[in-house]
Amino acid sequence: MTQKEQGQGFIEVVCGPMFAGKTEALIQRSNQALQLNKKILSFKPQIDDRYSVKEEIVSHNQNTIPAILIDKSKDILPFITPEINVVIIDEAQFLDNDIVAIVDYLANCNIEVIISGLELDFCGKPFGPMPYLLAIADTVTKLTSICAISGKKANRTQRLIDGKPAQSNEPVVLVGGKEYHEPRCRKHHCLADIDKTKINWQNFTNQSK
């Protein structure tokens, strides 16, 4: 696709823990773009079937917008045509790293790209392609939720298994809502087998010194 002459592309990443309103923010952006008569395409990973298996993005508040289900990032490209002004992508943490090059390309073609995702997984590690998307974004909107323990701002997602903190060796991806996850602040986010008062080298780097 050749670069458009009108409009200016950009990448906005909306991130935060679960229950922070990320998807709701995407839906608001979509509605605003519709009011401006912009042509929009929305995508979400096929794996995200928490609230619907249909071709739609659904917020926790059950608000929806139509969406195309994709298995891999390159599935987006065949849908991009010259009249598209805005591309919306939900739950980007579940996508492969090709999404980084793809959204960079779309923005360079003067398409507005708005992405949401969890920047941290349940262990507090950078999640999937999200750190790279945050690095190349023109705008980052960091949302917070409310910690289920302290009632303070929450920027992490606590995984619970049978109501107790998960072990760090649990699978990274566990699709689900309140039955498995709740928002927590830094102080109250924990893993059953990790002592947070010690440096956890493997969480952030392969180097031990």
From Swiss-Prot:
GO terms for cellular component: cytosol. GO terms for biological process: DNA biosynthetic process; thymidine metabolic process. It catalyses: thymidine + ATP = dTMP + ADP + H(+). It is an enzyme of class 2 (transferase). Coiled coil: none annotated. The keyword Ubl conjugation does not apply. The active site is at E91. The keyword Ribonucleoprotein does not apply. ATP binds at G16, P17, M18, F19, A20, G21, K22, T23, D90, E91, A92, Q93. InterPro entries: P-loop_NTPase, Thymidine_kinase. GO terms for molecular function: ATP binding; thymidine kinase activity. Its EC number is 2.7.1.21. Keywords: ATP-binding, Cytoplasm, DNA synthesis, Kinase, Nucleotide-binding, Transferase. Belongs to the thymidine kinase family. This is Thymidine kinase. It comes from Onion yellows phytoplasma (strain OY-M). The gene is tdk.
